[in-house]
């Protein structure tokens, strides 16, 4: 009887040790490796981002391109042309073009075209007329100076204009910006209230304005000189801008 009890206790001890070992295992409560791998692939944000962003990258130009219009009237971003420089400057030359993916256009007869011929003048983008591109403005340069100063502007060709080379280019332009000062207002203030320095204060030249104010316009001499200088445009705004 005692041996039977000892055998039962031994079996219970072995069973309890097995249960404790299983419960303390690091794999309890976790998915099998293949299930965990499948979950990580299905819920990966990288995979979803790539698949959802790819059509946006390829179709971002489609909204700018009219559908069903003439192929020859499409903007430059909507077509792909086999451009080359083997042409005479200023003369028209024919180039073979095709609409980009997702863009549909027709010929003059209303038939859909995959390839068409586009006639362009042989000239680079930086050789276009100033009305055919837009350039950045600069308010950091003096417009009233001798010789006239220039600044480096970034220019971009208009959408409907076709040309050779890069559509974004750098160009040296004259400083030509205004701060809102009117020449007529400055001249009127110089004639009427120039003795109190009102013209100089209006142009932002407060030091000269204080000098005229406390000297009563230089006893009239400074006032007459300022009328002449403002009248011919020699004296301008203190920020270096042009008159309106």
From Swiss-Prot:
UniProt key word Membrane: yes
Keyword annotations of the record: Glycoprotein, Membrane, Signal, Transmembrane, Transmembrane helix
Cleavable signal peptide: 1-21
Annotated glycan sites: 86, 94, 115, 137, 152, 176
Regions of this protein lying in the Cytoplasmic compartment: 198-212
Membrane topology per record: Multi-pass membrane protein
Domain TM2: 180-227
Transmembrane segments: 177-197, 213-233
GO annotation, cellular component aspect: membrane
InterPro entries: TM2, TM2D1-3-like
Protein location: Membrane
Extracellular compartment spans: 22-176, 234-244
Entry's family note: Belongs to the TM2 family.
The protein, known as: TM2 domain-containing protein 3
Organism: Danio rerio
Species lineage: Eukaryota, Metazoa, Chordata, Craniata, Vertebrata
Gene of this entry: tm2d3
């Amino acid at each position: 009887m005692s041996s039977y009890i000892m055998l039962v206790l031994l079996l219970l001890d072995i069973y309890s040790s097995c249960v404790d070992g299983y419960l303390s295992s690091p794999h309890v409560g976790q998915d099998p490796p293949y299930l965990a791998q499948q979950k990580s692939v299905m819920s990966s944000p990288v995979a979803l981002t790539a698949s959802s962003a790819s059509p946006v990258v390829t179709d971002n130009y489609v909204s700018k391109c009219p559908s069903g219009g003439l192929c020859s009237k499409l903007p430059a971003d909507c077509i792909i042309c086999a451009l080359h420089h083997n042409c005479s400057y200023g003369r028209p030359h024919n180039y073979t073009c095709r609409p980009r993916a997702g863009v549909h256009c027709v010929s003059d007869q209303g038939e859909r075209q995959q390839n068409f011929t586009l006639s362009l003048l042989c000239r680079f983008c930086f050789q276009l007329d100033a009305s055919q591109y837009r350039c950045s403005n600069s308010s950091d340069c003096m417009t009233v100076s001798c010789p006239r100063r220039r600044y480096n502007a970034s220019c971009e060709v208009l959408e409907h204009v076709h040309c050779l080379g890069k559509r974004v280019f750098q160009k040296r332009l004259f400083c030509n910006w205004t701060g809102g000062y009117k020449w007529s207002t400055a001249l009127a203030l110089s004639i009427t209230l120039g003795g109190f320095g009102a013209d100089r204060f209006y142009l932002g030249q407060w030091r000269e304005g204080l000098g005229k104010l406390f000297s009563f316009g230089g006893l009239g001499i400074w006032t007459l000189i300022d009328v002449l200088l403002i009248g011919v445009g020699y004296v301008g705004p203190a920020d270096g801008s042009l008159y309106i």
